[in-house]
Amino acid sequence: MEVSGHPQARRCCPEALGKLFPGLCFLCFLVTYALVGAVVFSAIEDGQVLVAADDGEFEKFLEELCRILNCSETVVEDRKQDLQGHLQKVKPQWFNRTTHWSFLSSLFFCCTVFSTVGYGYIYPVTRLGKYLCMLYALFGIPLMFLVLTDTGDILATILSTSYNRFRKFPFFTRPLLSKWCPKSLFKKKPDPKPADEAVPQIIISAEELPGPKLGTCPSRPSCSMELFERSHALEKQNTLQLPPQAMERSNSCPELVLGRLSYSIISNLDEVGQQVERLDIPLPIIALIVFAYISCAAAILPFWETQLDFENAFYFCFVTLTTIGFGDTVLEHPNFFLFFSIYIIVGMEIVFIAFKLVQNRLIDIYKNVMLFFAKGKFYHLVKK
């Protein structure tokens, strides 16, 4: 029994490594890419004074503000419009003259770049930093999407397996699920044919065969000679020797050519993103998962970001996971938020799955509407 278990274990290990290896590689590349970007941006941007603060624009703004305010009380009401319009010219960088690009803040900036969040209150100010940021995003964003796609396959497998198990419970009734699930989930697959089912035999009579019929060939020496020549030619054709050629390795079994581990890795790379496309669960369930996932972070975030309550923290997490990133909520301790990097990656993938399911439902609705018009039902309703 022990001897027979070794070959099975040897087959399972390469397959398991082949499934985990692409995701681990993508994740390691992303972490390395973020660390390298943090080192580069902290070296370029640290201690730089904002250019906009040195060109006299801020001083001109203050002089104009003093001129507007240096008036009597009777003129104040008339100058309110001028004051309001002038205050709209305020630039945020005037009140943050020196940037603080430590390693952790630079790492936080890199994460906001390739995750396409971009809160807006951390940004490069030097010309080299801006050019480097564009180049960094060109390679970082596709790498982030690769990680999200591979993570999405894992999440889709977990969600699909969990949902199929919960469907077996009594409270998951079919009328309840049929409101939110596509009909494809309830279609019964046809039963396979039994193995012992009799296969109908096709009998062809001798009269239906082409060529001379049995018993119709005249007993002549020419007829027998003709049959002999045909059989001799057929035998000679079958035994014809082909010229020797160079032996080539067959590609019918790629595992022998590449090795079991390499073949498993390549085959799993070809299947990246397929599980997300096949996932199909009810919208209320995925909406509940998104709400619970964001609520967990919203409950933890105010412990170190004391200026945020649960409502504002929930809003901040939602804006982050949907990659909107308005920048209206500024974190006082962004370094702590780096510990939520895995949370952000998984959360972005959950939100992406939710959007994908909503997109599929909208496509189904659109198809049903088009079929409704195509079948002429709308014409008959209008005619009535």
UniProtKB/Swiss-Prot annotation:
One of its GO terms (cellular component) is plasma membrane. Expressed in dorsal root ganglion and trigeminal ganglion neurons. Detected at low levels in spinal cord. Expressed in regulatory T cells (at protein level). K(+) 1 binds at residues 116-117. It catalyses: K(+)(in) = K(+)(out). Residues 103-129, 314-328 dip into the membrane without crossing it. The chain crosses the membrane at residues 24-44, 130-148, 281-301, 335-355. The modification Phosphoserine is found at residues 252, 264. The keyword Transcription regulation does not apply. Residues 323-328 are annotated as: Selectivity filter 2. Residues 249-254 are annotated as: Interaction with YWHAH. Residues 200-205 are annotated as: Interaction with calcineurin. Keywords: Cell membrane, Disulfide bond, Glycoprotein, Ion channel, Ion transport, Membrane, Metal-binding, Phosphoprotein, Potassium, Potassium channel, Potassium transport, Transmembrane, Transmembrane helix, Transport. Changing residue 231 to P: No effect on potassium channel activity. Residues 116-121 are annotated as: Selectivity filter 1. One of its GO terms (biological process) is cellular response to pH. N-glycosylated. Phosphorylation of Ser-264 is required for the binding of 14-3-3eta/YWHAH. Calcineurin-mediated dephosphorylation enhances channel activity. Its main location: membrane. Glycans are attached at residue 70. It is found in: Cell membrane. The record marks 96 as: Not glycosylated. Residues 1-23, 149-280, 356-384 are cytoplasmic. K(+) 3 binds at residues 118-119. Homodimer. Heterodimer with KCNK2. Heterodimer with KCNK10. Interacts with calcineurin. Interacts with YWHAH, in a phosphorylation-dependent manner. Each subunit contributes two pore-forming domains 1 and 2 which assemble to form a single pore with M2 and M4 transmembrane helices lining the central cavity and M1 and M3 facing the lipid bilayer. The transmembrane helices are bridged by the selectivity filters 1 and 2 carrying a signature sequence TxTTxGYGD that coordinate the permeant ions. Up to four ions can simultaneously occupy the selectivity filter and at least two elementary charges must translocate across the filter to convert it into the open conformation. Belongs to the two pore domain potassium channel (TC 1.A.1.8) family. This is Potassium channel subfamily K member 18. It comes from Homo sapiens.
